Amino acid sequence: MNHNRSTLNELMADISRKDVERLVKRRSPIKEADLTAMNLEKFNFEGAIFTKCKFTGSTFIGSDFAFSRFEECILDDCEMYGSHMQESSFIECDLSKSDLRDCVLIEVNFRQSILHSVDFSGSFIKDSVLLNVKGDLCDFSFTSLSSANFSGAKMHVCDFTACRSGDLKAADADFTGSEFIGAHLDSSLLQGTILNFCNFSEASLQECDLSRARLLSATMNNARLNTSILNEVLLMDAKAGGTELNDVNLDNANLTKADFSKSIFNGSSMNGVLDQDTIYDGAKLEGVIR
């Protein structure tokens, strides 16, 4: 049996869709196969195992990836629109420039994968793991990111506009230069997260833990951060006009040169705050503890 599998792997460059279907149905692991530009539309990958395979330019539109496992695979420039993934794994894979719009991803593991210019817009992503992923220019606009875990991820200049992401976990992640306009991120854990130059205008970050987060030159106009934890946060040179900061912990925060015009700080704790040249024009600071 082992000899037959090794022979199959040597011939994978010429593998057909029917061959893949047969191997997947038999639960046979597929290794080091070249599946470049293959049409795998509406394919049933349930329980499939792929290791170090190349799928560059392949089509997976409407496919079912339930309980499948991909390790060290190249899945770049693939069409995966409208696919369903439940308890699937893409460990140390490269999904750069792939289209995952309007997909359903439940308990999917993308740990340590490369996500350059991946389009997740409009997808439903729940309880999924994106630990230590690396990427930039990704599109998560209008996605649902319920309980997703981005801890340790580096996702620069990505678009999270209007995404809904309650209970997001992203401790020590780096989202430098990303857009979160109108996003709903309530109850998220963002301790030590790098959010420099990000735009949170009109976003909701209520009851979040942003302790030690870095928001250098961030834009937060009309954002809502009520009852959030922002102790030791860096908000230097931030633009936060009209922001709601009721009952917030800002102890030892650095607000130097930030603009909080017409913002509301009622009932907040601001012990040890650095606010040299900070603008509070028209701000409300009733019951603030300093």
Language-model-derived ranges and their functions:
Residues 4-290:
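Tandem repeat scaffolds
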